[in-house]
Amino acid sequence: MNPLRKKRLVIILAILVGVGAAVGLALSALQQNINLFYTPTQIANGEAPKDTRIRAGGMVEKGSLVRSGDSLDAKFNVTDFNKTVTITYRGILPDLFREGQGIVALGKLNADDVVVADEVLAKHDEKYMPPEVAKALKDSGQSAPAPGKEG
């Protein structure tokens, strides 16, 4: 092999190794940032991974919200009208958070099948429903409750 050909081969191999490393790092970063959505039924059936960041969503069950008197801790149940999952959250709940409305919680599922959320997203108006929640409710054979007037 002449020196010119050898030099080209080394350059091509170096480029391939560099591209491979870049793709590997990108895939690794994306895999760590992907938060899959799970319904309360999927969580109750054991389909959601434990100790991995997930998104859980559904309708907040009426009468299930319990706030701590001396801290920002909140505990509530979310349902897809088939099964229910408990969510705990430490922080200020969004202004639009209400019982009977759709939410998506981001957090980790613990060993007791309780989602320990570090972020709670509430719908932003009476007509909006997070797409994942709307699909989960449709799949369960239910529809979202009609928006009522609150005053």
UniProtKB/Swiss-Prot annotation:
Subcellular location: Cell inner membrane
Molecular function via GO: heme binding; metal ion binding
Primary localization class, coarse: membrane
InterPro entries, sorted: CcmE, CcmE-like_sf, NA-bd_OB-fold
Positions that bind heme: 124, 128
Gene3D superfamilies: Nucleic acid-binding proteins
Chain ranges on the Cytoplasmic side, renumbered to this chain: 1-8
Transmembrane domains' residue ranges: 9-29
Keyword Metal-binding included in the entry's annotation: yes
Membrane topology value: Single-pass type II membrane protein
GO cellular component, one term: plasma membrane
Periplasmic side: 30-151
Swiss-Prot/TrEMBL GO biological process terms: cytochrome complex assembly
Keywords assigned by UniProt, alphabetized: Cell inner membrane, Cell membrane, Cytochrome c-type biogenesis, Heme, Iron, Membrane, Metal-binding, Signal-anchor, Transmembrane, Transmembrane helix
Function of the protein: Heme chaperone required for the biogenesis of c-type cytochromes. Transiently binds heme delivered by CcmC and transfers the heme to apo-cytochromes in a process facilitated by CcmF and CcmH.
Family per record: Belongs to the CcmE/CycJ family.
UniProt protein name: Cytochrome c-type biogenesis protein CcmE 2
Species annotation: Pseudomonas fluorescens (strain Pf0-1)
Encoding gene per record: ccmE2
